[in-house]
């Protein structure tokens, strides 16, 4: 069988399954099987496909047909121009999180912060992007779950950042408190979706992405309060705390920050004009 014919079959299966991105997904999956980039797939229609390659391709097509996210199948994703390993068990990075990273990068540069903490780090994209961009920082990425912890370690090695980025296991900031660490900036994209909203999410999210990385408790605020409360013991005076938030959580998260004595609370909107990032300072 030639590449063009196999690709057309893949298109048909995914289109029938109502996968909106059926063409690009089929191309990327074939590229994964052949270990070729998408340009090769698009410019070599007569390339001969072996039987075992065909079988492997349709195994992957079947996963996508059943709504497994394409990035889990590929095992990689891009974030702010960097490539990261991801797998089932870690949240798939969203473009919205780039607003958070851009905000904290500016904060770190403006205030000459050195000691940075990424809590609920998932695949490590926030801490690693900071470390990759700013080589005069020291970053600790915390997560309590094995898969995120190990994935973050893989991504640190992938970008050769072992000298300034570390992954450690911790329930929020518990280990940082035990070890009496101090940070200039704490950043987090914690689970923040309300429990009752999870069931309304798209199939590829609620069926495959980890519940514990999505659900922020009954009101969506559980992790914000936990991190903010613990941060008082490890965040330096004059330090900054920054979060990604849900579009409707500005008032509640601002209230928690104020309750714990944080000042200069500022909310930043995303490109769609929705509240997306909140930051505040400890005095």
Swiss-Prot record:
Signal peptide: none annotated. Keywords: Methyltransferase, S-adenosyl-L-methionine, Transferase. It catalyses: L-glutaminyl-[peptide chain release factor] + S-adenosyl-L-methionine = N(5)-methyl-L-glutaminyl-[peptide chain release factor] + S-adenosyl-L-homocysteine + H(+). GO terms for molecular function: nucleic acid binding; protein-(glutamine-N5) methyltransferase activity; protein-glutamine N-methyltransferase activity. The keyword Disulfide bond does not apply. Belongs to the protein N5-glutamine methyltransferase family. PrmC subfamily. This is Release factor glutamine methyltransferase. It comes from Clostridium botulinum (strain Hall / ATCC 3502 / NCTC 13319 / Type A).
């Amino acid at each position: 069988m030639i590449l063009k014919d196999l690709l057309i079959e893949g298109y048909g299966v995914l289109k029938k399954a109502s996968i909106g991105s059926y063409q690009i997904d089929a191309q990327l999956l074939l590229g994964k099987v052949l270990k070729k980039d998408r340009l090769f797939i698009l410019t070599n229609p007569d390339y001969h496909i072996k039987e075992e390659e065909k079988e492997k391709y349709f195994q992957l097509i079947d996963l996508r047909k059943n709504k497994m996210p394409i990035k889990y199948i590929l095992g990689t994703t891009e974030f702010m121009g960097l490539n990261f390993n991801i797998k089932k068990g870690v949240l798939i990075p969203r473009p919205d999180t780039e607003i958070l990273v851009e905000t904290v990068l500016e904060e770190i540069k403006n205030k000459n912060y050195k000691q940075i903490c990424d809590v609920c780090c998932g695949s490590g994209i926030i801490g690693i992007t900071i470390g990759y961009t700013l080589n005069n920082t020291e970053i600790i990425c915390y997560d309590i779950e094995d898969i995120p912890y190990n994935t973050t370690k893989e991504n640190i090695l992938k970008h050769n950042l072992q000298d300034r980025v570390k992954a450690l296991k911790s329930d929020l900031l518990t280990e940082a408190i035990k070890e009496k660490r101090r940070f200039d900036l704490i950043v987090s994209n914690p689970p923040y979706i309300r429990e009752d909203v999870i069931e309304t999410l798209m199939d590829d999210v609620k069926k495959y992405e980890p519940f514990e990385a999505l659900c922020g408790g009954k009101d969506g605020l559980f992790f914000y309060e936990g991190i903010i409360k613990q941060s008082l013991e490890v965040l330096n005076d004059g330090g900054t705390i920054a979060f990604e938030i849900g579009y409707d959580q500005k008032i509640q998260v601002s209230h928690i920050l104020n309750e714990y004595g944080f000042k200069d609370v500022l909310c930043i909107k995303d490109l769609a004009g929705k509240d997306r990032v909140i930051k505040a300072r400890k005095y």
